[in-house]
Amino acid sequence: MRIPRWPVLGAVVLVAMVASGVALGVGPWPGLAPSVAASSGDVRYTAARAHGSTTVKAIRAGSVIASATFAGAYGIPAVTSAGKAGGLSPDGRLLVLAEPPSYKGLRSESRFLLVSTGALSLVDTIVLKGEFGFDAVSPDRRTLYLIQHVSRTDLVTYVVRAYDLRAKRLLARVIVDKREPGETMRGYPVARATSARGVWVYTLYTRSPDGGRPFVHALNAVARAAFCIDLPRWPNRDIWDARLELASDGRQLVVRSGATAVARIDTASLTVVR
């Protein structure tokens, strides 16, 4: 995947997105989601901030079944511009809370809370130097994937990082497509789909407003590996309504814009087949 380089200020990019009707937080992140549901769908978690603390609730069938309050302001991280919620491990046992997005550019420090959903108890607090946002959690709950932004003048340039939850440290190696290790990653997340067991996390990115081709970032959350798949061009005005659909057998990922299948990706070869 060849990425065109353009020196547009991140703020200009975000203003353009807002003007197009896209819902997102100010800064390099999509913002926070109101709640996130377990894969089973029977329990939903919310995070409300007030007076310097955050109250997390587990809700089933409209009733609060558990509640806990933690110091600091945190929320359910969104992972796409449409506000799709993230934060839960695939097995639903770990909830990652993130700080609200910054309104003043890149932060010098990022914090995350790790909460056990069994008793809504605090597992750990992660503090990292720099601007980091939530991306995904591996199925074995060993790895927390983060998106790191390092440019103050180009907020859509990013790198994927891995945090070892057992060793409690950020790994030095950046998660890149080994087929093109020197590429620069840039774009904004539009849609996401995850395989049944959470091994593969697929995210559709746009390169708006430079007109570059959109791409799917395929993360193997177990192997700590990533692959980028270039897609055919289609009008930027339509990409914000795009969605990813994973076949029930996991063998094909369909990129749709409205009723149109823009691309079909073979998940074994990670190539566009039609």
Where is each model-derived feature located?
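Beta-propeller blade signature
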Residues: 109-117, 158-165, 214-221
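Bacterial N-terminal signal peptides
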Residues: 10-21
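Short coil/turn segments that connect the beta-strands within blades of beta-propeller domains
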Residues: 41-42, 91-93, 140-142, 197-199, ...
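Repeated scaffold domains used in trafficking and secretory/extracellular systems
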Residues: 29-39, 75-87, 130-138, 180-193, ...
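Short loop/turn segments that connect beta-strands within beta-propeller blades
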Residues: 60-63, 116-120, 164-168, 220-224, ...
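Residue position within the beta-strands of beta-propeller blades
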Residues: 46, 97, 146-147, 202-203, ...
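Short glycine/acidic-enriched loop and turn motifs that connect beta-strands
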Residues: 49-53, 100-105, 149-154, 207-211, ...
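A short beta-strand motif characteristic of beta-propeller blades
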Residues: 26-29, 64-77, 121-127, 169-183, ...
